[in-house]
């Protein structure tokens, strides 16, 4: 299995997502203190890779539509992502 490598900003966003219930874009932005447009860009990349999922489905995730969307960790990658976060 391939080892997941994440940037510091990707790690911050993934750590801000609640594993049990998910988090809205606004909650993620508040927890990370990253600019909204940058959070939207990071979330879009994580969704494209498959590490995160967005509800309701919007493609692409943009600064205009991320705030009210709910983001969850993809259960298929949950263990690998937790391991990647522990390494840093």
What does each model-found stretch correspond to?
Residues 15-19:
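Short, locally clustered residues in the helix-turn-helix/winged-helix DNA-binding domain
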Residues 59-65:
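Intrinsically disordered, low-complexity Ser/Thr- and acidic-rich flexible linkers and loops
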Residues 33-49, 53-55, 68:
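Short amphipathic alpha-helical interaction segments
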Residues 27, 53-58:
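Short amphipathic alpha-helical segments at helix boundaries and their inter-helical linkers
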Residues 5-6, 34, 73:
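Alpha-helical hairpin
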Residues 22-31:
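Short acidic, hydrophobic short linear motifs in intrinsically disordered regions
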Residues 1-13:
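Short alpha-helical segments that sit at the start of domains
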Residues 68-88:
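Short, amphipathic alpha-helical interaction segments positioned at domain boundaries
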């Amino acid at each position: 299995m391939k080892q997941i490598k994440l940037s510091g900003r990707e790690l911050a966003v993934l750590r801000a997502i609640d594993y049990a219930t998910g988090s809205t874009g606004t909650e993620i932005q508040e927890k990370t203190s990253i600019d909204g447009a940058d959070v939207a860009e990071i979330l879009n990349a994580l969704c494209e890779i498959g590490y995160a999922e967005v509800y309701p489905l919007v493609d692409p995730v943009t600064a205009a539509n991320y705030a009210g969307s709910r983001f969850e960790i993809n259960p298929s990658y949950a263990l690998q992502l937790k391991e990647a976060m522990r390494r840093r």
